[in-house]
Swiss-Prot record:
GO molecular function: proton-transporting ATP synthase activity, rotational mechanism
Organism: Capsella bursa-pastoris (Shepherd's purse)
Record key words, sorted: ATP synthesis, CF(0), Chloroplast, Hydrogen ion transport, Ion transport, Membrane, Plastid, Thylakoid, Transmembrane, Transmembrane helix, Transport
InterPro entries: ATP_synth_b/b'su_bac/chlpt
Family stated for the protein in its record: Belongs to the ATPase B chain family.
Transmembrane segments: 27-49
Topology term for the membrane: Single-pass membrane protein
Xref: Pfam families: ATP-synt_B
Something else known: In plastids the F-type ATPase is also known as CF(1)CF(0).
Role played: F(1)F(0) ATP synthase produces ATP from ADP in the presence of a proton or sodium gradient. F-type ATPases consist of two structural domains, F(1) containing the extramembraneous catalytic core and F(0) containing the membrane proton channel, linked together by a central stalk and a peripheral stalk. During catalysis, ATP synthesis in the catalytic domain of F(1) is coupled via a rotary mechanism of the central stalk subunits to proton translocation.
Primary location class: plastid
Annotated protein name in UniProt: ATP synthase subunit b, chloroplastic
């Protein structure tokens, strides 16, 4: 703290008469000293300040230019992405429509093939029934024929005596004899 107050005391100290120096006491400086200091600052600082401002201006302009280029690139990428999105959506719609029509086509094919299979099964069933009916009819005919034959044989055996039997044989032999004479 003491150093701080000492520095204010030294600022208030005037240089001795006859010497040239700057008054470091800001409150006690006169306008001539201030104008000299400002003149030196303006003269030498003007170029530095202009260079600093020009550099800053160039950096800002470059940044704006780069930002504009990046913005243009981003807009172009956005447009490309939108175009790809529209293309993908169109293709998805095509696939969706084709998929639905493919499903409907497959469903129709399945219904048609099922109908054909059912029709074939119906035909096989009818053929099997017809075959079984024919087989049953043939079996019944065969049994009826066997029973009729057995009945006829039984009737013949009961009706025929040896004498009748011999006459029938002789009559048949006679018929064969006349047939032979006719054919010769």
């Amino acid at each position: 703290m003491k150093n701080l107050t000492d520095s204010f005391v030294y600022l208030g100290h005037w240089p001795s008469a006859g010497s040239f120096g700057f008054n470091t006491d800001i409150l006690a400086t006169n306008p001539i000293n201030l104008s000299v200091v400002f003149g030196v600052l303006v003269f030498f600082g003007k170029g530095v300040l202009n260079d600093l401002l020009d550099n800053r201006k160039q950096r800002i302009l470059n940044t704006i230019r780069n930002s504009e280029e990046l913005r243009e690139g981003a807009i172009q990428q956005l447009e490309n992405a939108r175009a790809r999105l529209r293309k993908v959506e169109t293709e998805a719609d095509k696939f969706r429509v084709n998929g639905y029509s493919e499903i409907e086509r497959e469903q129709l094919n399945l219904i048609n093939s099922t109908y054909k299979t059912l029709k074939q099964l119906e035909n096989y069933k009818n053929e099997t029934i017809l075959f079984e009916q024919q087989r049953t009819i043939n079996q019944v005919r065969e049994r009826v024929f066997q029973q009729a034959l057995q009945g006829a044989i039984g009737t013949l055996n009961s009706c025929l005596s040896n004498e009748l039997h011999l006459r029938t044989i002789n009559a048949n032999i006679g018929m064969f004899g006349t047939m032979k004479e006719i054919t010769d």
